[in-house]
């Protein structure tokens, strides 16, 4: 359950063991119910907020181009912020069960999408082979967040995948200012933006990109580690998941 896997379980054995098992099942049910209710509520909020945003876009389309360009960027920023809030609140509730997945293919897809947008990044040669139990959509989201974060604060980034017998490591490195060691734990918390190296002026957002990636890593029984990139000199972000 801690790794995001719902396994059928029926308490058995001694009285104390059965009591502990039933208490765990009750706890799991309460957690699942809370996640479902939160997701439904925020999905409704998201829908209600998208309607006025659509009206704003329609109204802006009637203005002259030179008058509406900055306003359209503001509306687009609001849309991205809304999507980030919803993704963070949704967590893993709608992402399905883990399936045997090729991590190299996932990384290649995320890199190709960023390259199509004109971003400067590359995928390192693969290290190791094999399938890993992952939620593909969630891991793709985590990689996209890390790549977007890297390119927001740097000019170039590199993505690499290492598969060993015991673990999977998805790494994103950049040539930006990095994050001081004493601030890395803080950087993984939601709604945290660090100053002055990584501040609001560097791009839109509310500090959810790393938090969402860390949440996805934890839901797979893994972790998101932040460090210094010896190769590029900036931040090194590792998603490490046990196999």
Put a short name on every predicted segment.
Residues 156-166:
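Short beta-strand/loop element within the Bergerat-fold HATPase_c
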Residues 92-97, 131-134:
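Conserved micro-motifs of the catalytic ATP-binding
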Residues 4-7, 11-26:
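HAMP signal relay modules and closely related sensory coiled-coil linkers
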Residues 31-80:
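Membrane-proximal coiled-coil signaling linkers
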């Amino acid at each position: 359950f801690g790794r995001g896997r719902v396994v059928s379980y029926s308490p058995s054995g001694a009285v104390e063991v059965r009591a502990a098992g039933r208490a765990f099942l009750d706890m799991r049910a309460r957690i699942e119910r809370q996640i479902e209710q939160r997701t439904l509520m925020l999905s409704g909020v998201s829908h209600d907020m998208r309607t006025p945003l659509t009206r704003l876009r329609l109204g802006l389309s009637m203005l002259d181009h030179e008058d509406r360009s900055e306003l359209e960027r503001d509306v687009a920023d609001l849309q991205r912020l809304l999507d980030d809030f919803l993704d963070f609140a949704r967590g893993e509730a709608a992402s399905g069960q883990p399936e045997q997945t090729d991590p190299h293919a996932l990384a290649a897809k995320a890199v190709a999408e960023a390259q199509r947008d004109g971003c400067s990044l590359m995928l390192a040669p693969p290290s190791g082979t094999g399938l890993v139990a992952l939620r593909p959509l969630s891991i793709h989201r985590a990689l996209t967040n890390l790549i977007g974060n890297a390119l927001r604060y740097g000019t170039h980034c590199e993505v690499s995948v290492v598969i060993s017998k015991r673990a999977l490591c998805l790494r994103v490195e950049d040539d930006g200012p990095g994050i001081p060691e004493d601030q890395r734990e803080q950087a993984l918390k939601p709604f945290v933006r660090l100053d002055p190296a990584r501040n609001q002026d560097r791009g839109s957002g509310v500090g959810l990109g790393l938090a969402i990636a860390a949440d996805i890593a934890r839901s797979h029984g893994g972790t998101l580690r932040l460090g210094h990139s010896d190769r590029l000199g900036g931040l090194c972000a590792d998603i490490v998941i046990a196999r």
